[in-house]
């Protein structure tokens, strides 16, 4: 953000993203990829590299993965998604230990946001009574 932007109020776009996994499914088109469903906070793009964190596990180390596809609630393929329930395809996601409650996020996300996303995903996955998105 330069001086000109500062003086005239142009704000830098928030680049952080947090996504709690509420459901996981195999990808029928590519068995190595993994499809997950959940609520995205921030903006996620196809091609983004995200960190996979399992807050409920003492053994899993954070891992990095790439988002290969996004689908909105209307089942339309999109290039980016923000603040909505979405279907995310994780490239080579099968090799990562992803389950309900796993959090996908960008660098620099606070511990509070990670925990809030984890709790939201767990509550929706096990207590909301909804299936899918």
For every predicted segment, state its role.
Residues 1-9:
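Short acidic, low-complexity intrinsically disordered linear motifs used
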């Amino acid at each position: 953000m330069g001086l000109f932007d500062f003086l005239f109020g142009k704000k830098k776009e928030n680049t952080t993203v947090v996504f709690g996994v509420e459901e996981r499914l195999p990808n029928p088109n590519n068995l190595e990829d993994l499809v997950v469903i959940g609520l995205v906070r921030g903006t996620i793009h196809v091609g983004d590299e995200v960190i996979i964190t399992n807050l409920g596990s003492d053994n899993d180390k954070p891992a990095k993965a790439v988002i290969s596809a996004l689908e909105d609630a209307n089942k339309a393929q999109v290039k980016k998604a923000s603040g909505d329930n979405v279907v995310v395809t994780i490239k080579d996601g099968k090799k990562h230990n992803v389950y309900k409650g796993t959090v996908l996020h960008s660098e620099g996300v606070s511990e509070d946001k990670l925990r809030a996303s984890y709790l939201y995903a767990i509550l929706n996955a096990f207590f909301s009574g909804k299936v899918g998105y």
